[in-house]
């Protein structure tokens, strides 16, 4: 089992996200509990490319201070929505014999969605703890509706197990 923290970068980890305070508190807690139990915490960052704001080398590309990786924790960079495509993450997890991925991060309707579905397709048991992913309002749906659509309808029992926060803490502690 690993804890995968997706795209919690400085540019997009802010209070404009749906339910930001709960998201922030829960992700911090899961990182802490995973570390306490020697469960590997792995980070993923999204790089939009040289002519974009969210690109390697810019401060906003770095992981949000509240979730910052410790020295030695793995960070994989990606240029597409899925954390599994051409990043080395898939091979890394397979080589370690991992089969369960607890996934948290941003954004619900972009990289979280792609990562959960691709992880499922690669045979991983994908676990999504309640209120540990988020997104922004858009022209079509509020961040809240987007969150509920993915977590309560699209992912649960199709591509992932969407479980309570407390159940996830129990998994990490066992």
Model-found features: residue ranges?
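Glycine-rich, proline-tolerant flexible connector loops at the mouths of alpha/beta enzymes
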Residues: 48-52
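Short, glycine/acidic-enriched capping/hinge loops at junctions between secondary-structure elements
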Residues: 15-17, 53-55
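Active-site-adjacent betaalpha module
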Residues: 2, 29, 35, 54-174
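Short acidic, Gly/Ser-rich segments with clustered Asp/Glu that frequently serve as metal-coordination loops
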Residues: 9-15
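A short alpha/beta connector and helix-capping loop motif
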Residues: 16-43, 47
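Short coil-to-beta-strand
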Residues: 1-7
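Active-site loop/turn elements of alpha/beta-hydrolase fold enzymes
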Residues: 8, 46, 131
């Amino acid at each position: 089992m690993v804890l995968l923290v997706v795209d919690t970068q400085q540019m997009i980890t802010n209070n404009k996200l749906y339910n930001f305070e709960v998201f922030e508190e829960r992700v911090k807690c899961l990182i802490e509990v995973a570390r306490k139990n020697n469960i590997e915490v792995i980070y993923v960052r999204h790089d939009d490319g040289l002519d974009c704001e969210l690109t390697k080398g810019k401060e906003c590309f770095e992981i949000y201070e509240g979730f910052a990786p410790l020295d030695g924790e793995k960070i994989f960079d990606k240029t597409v929505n899925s954390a599994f495509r051409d990043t080395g993450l898939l091979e890394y997890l397979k080589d370690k014999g991992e089969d369960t991925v607890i996934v948290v991060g941003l954004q619900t309707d972009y990289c979280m969605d792609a990562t959960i579905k691709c992880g499922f397709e690669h045979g991983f048991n994908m676990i999504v703890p309640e209120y540990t992913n988020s997104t922004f309002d858009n022209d079509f749906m509020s961040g809240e509706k987007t969150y509920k659509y993915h977590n309560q309808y699209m992912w649960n029992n199709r591509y992932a197990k969407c479980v309570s926060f407390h159940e996830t803490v129990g998994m990490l502690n066992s």
